[in-house]
């Protein structure tokens, strides 16, 4: 009898999950496009108070439906996907009832004003003739999104409004120039859409002026989330069993351990580069580490060589993974491309994988030459930061065996519902990529020079988590933040300035790298302890990434750890 009951519970859950996803994609058309469902490509999110109230009621209705199901009776993937959906709905309700970002954060609207258009241009999921009508429809919707933003926004934090001004300029450039690659493929349609293009750019110009002249002078909100909201948001965003206090405690301890490890890695290199150094200098941990990092920064690519170099490194890393038998390599294509102009100047590279509902797409490893308007000094500083060895470490993180490999494996996972595919865990995904950096360095990839960069990036991930919590649940000042980054974790000034800004604009996101990596390393240690000499690294890695991208706590459960 039990099985019959379980089956009805499974059927009931699958129906709820299917209905939930359907309404989610309908209410978030930009997300639908990104995920690879193109039924809503001509629509934008409705940010009106009525729509938001209706959306909250819908979430609560689905929460009640899930409460009627006995989760313990669910079989297979449904058992965990039920909990993932429940946690996600709770997060949505928390955002609607407590965070209320649409009322104070102008960056919320950029998803509709810029990203919605970019998504139609960036991926060749359909011929230009099919995508341009969606582009037209979305451009026609932009004035109503702007009207909603103007009506909703009160008490924005100043840094959010200033950033919205910059991003709106990016949206204007996108409408005027960034959509050209798509329009050039259909000359007649290009001609027809030109007046709308100009009108949309003018509407965005007007919005930018409103942000500068109206919202900015009254932007008196606090960028700090506050301890109570941060604790809740962190729990939802990370879906981790680690508490806020435990995360801070482990980050502080890890900071000291990693500072020691990077010094111990730097010391033999320092002696090689500076054979006449005296013992007092050799004992100065900070000086030795900084000098070696500085020396390694001298070997770097430039605008002309960066894309070619990245292609070589992808091949090198792939061969290393294969020859050391670390994890199964997928056969889905990876294209190394120059980064689109309007995305440049932030990170040097990112991995753009196809959405889980878009099974045919390629993965792009986008690599950035610097923006055209940068000075010679600024370009030099950027490429010193992203030097040859750092690009090798970054390629491990973004592509091989990091994001590209993991997401290709995740897209192979199938379950009765799409819950796990759509509500992927950023903590699992980022944690895997940071874990891969450490694993590759442990295996000797790139020698001590790459290990220096890996440990530097590890310090950066630790600092990210400390910043996130100290800023939003504490009162960390700009000076304290800059000291942590530049003195404790060897970051360049330009990078630290950008991170101080990002840490104020976002909350709970910067913790994902450290927490995810910590959970992955804890998981591996648990499996090593359990299996002893029978532990097989490749078998372990393949198993960890065989379940899609759920929170790490569920992978631990699935592996019986």
Language model segments and positions:
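N-terminal maturation segment of proteins
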Residues: 5-561
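Bacterial N-terminal signal peptides
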Residues: 1-3
């Amino acid at each position: 009898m039990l099985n019959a009951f379980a089956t009805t519970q499974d059927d009931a859950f699958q129906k709820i999950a299917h209905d939930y996803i359907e309404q989610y994609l309908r209410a978030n058309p930009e997300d639908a496009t990104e995920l690879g469902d193109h039924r809503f490509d001509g629509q934008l999110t409705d940010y009106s108070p009525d729509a938001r109230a209706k959306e909250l009621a819908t979430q609560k209705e689905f929460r009640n439906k899930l409460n009627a199901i006995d989760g313990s009776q669910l079989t297979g993937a449904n058992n965990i996907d039920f909990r993932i959906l429940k946690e996600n709905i709770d997060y949505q309700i928390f955002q609607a009832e407590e965070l209320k970002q649409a009322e104070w954060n102008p960056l919320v609207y950029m998803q509709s004003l810029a990203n919605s258009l970019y998504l139609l241009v960036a991926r060749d999921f359909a011929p230009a003739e099919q995508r341009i009508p969606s582009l037209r429809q979305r451009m026609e919707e932009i004035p109503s999104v702007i009207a909603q933003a103007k009506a909703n926004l009160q008490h924005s934090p100043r840094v959010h409004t200033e950033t919205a001004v910059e991003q709106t300029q990016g949206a204007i450039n996108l409408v005027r120039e960034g959509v050209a690659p798509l329009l050039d493929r259909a000359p007649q349609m290009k001609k027809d859409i030109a007046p709308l293009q100009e009108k949309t750019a003018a509407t965005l110009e007007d919005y930018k002026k409103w942000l500068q002249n109206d919202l900015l002078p009254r932007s008196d909100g606090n960028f700090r989330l506050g301890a109570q909201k941060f604790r809740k948001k962190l729990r939802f965003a990370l879906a981790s069993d680690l508490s806020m206090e435990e995360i801070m405690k482990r980050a502080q301890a890890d900071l000291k351990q990693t500072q020691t490890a990077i010094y111990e890695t730097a010391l033999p290199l320092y002696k090689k580069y500076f054979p006449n150094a005296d013992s007092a200098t050799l004992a100065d941990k900070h000086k030795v580490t900084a000098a070696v990092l500085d020396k390694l920064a001298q070997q770097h690519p430039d605008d002309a060589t960066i894309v070619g170099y990245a292609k070589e490194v992808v091949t090198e890393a792939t061969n290393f993974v294969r020859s050391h038998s670390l994890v199964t390599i997928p056969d889905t294509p990876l294209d190394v491309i120059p980064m689109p102009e309007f995305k440049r100047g932030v990170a040097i590279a990112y991995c753009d994988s196809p959405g889980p509902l878009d099974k045919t797409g390629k993965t792009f490893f986008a690599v950035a030459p610097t923006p055209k308007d940068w000075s010679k000094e600024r370009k030099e500083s950027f490429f010193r930061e992203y030097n040859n060895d750092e690009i090798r470490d970054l390629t491990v993180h973004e592509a091989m065996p990091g994001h590209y490999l993991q997401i290709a494996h995740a897209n192979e996972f199938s379950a009765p519902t799409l819950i796990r595919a759509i509500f992927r865990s950023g903590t699992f995904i980022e944690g895997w990529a940071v874990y891969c950096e450490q694993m590759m360095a442990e295996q000797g990839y790139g020698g001590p020079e790459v290990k220096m960069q890996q440990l530097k990036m590890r310090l950066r991930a630790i600092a990210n988590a400390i910043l996130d919590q100290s800023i939003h649940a504490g009162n960390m000042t700009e000076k304290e933040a800059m000291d942590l980054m530049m003195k404790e974790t060897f970051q360049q000034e330009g990078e630290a300035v950008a991170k101080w800004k990002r840490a104020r604009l976002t909350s709970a996101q910067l913790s994902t790298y450290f927490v995810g990596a910590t959970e992955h390393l804890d998981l591996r240690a648990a499996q090593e302890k359990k299996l002893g000499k029978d532990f097989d690294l490749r078998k372990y890695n393949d198993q960890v990434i065989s379940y899609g991208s759920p929170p790490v706590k569920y992978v631990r459960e699935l592996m019986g750890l």
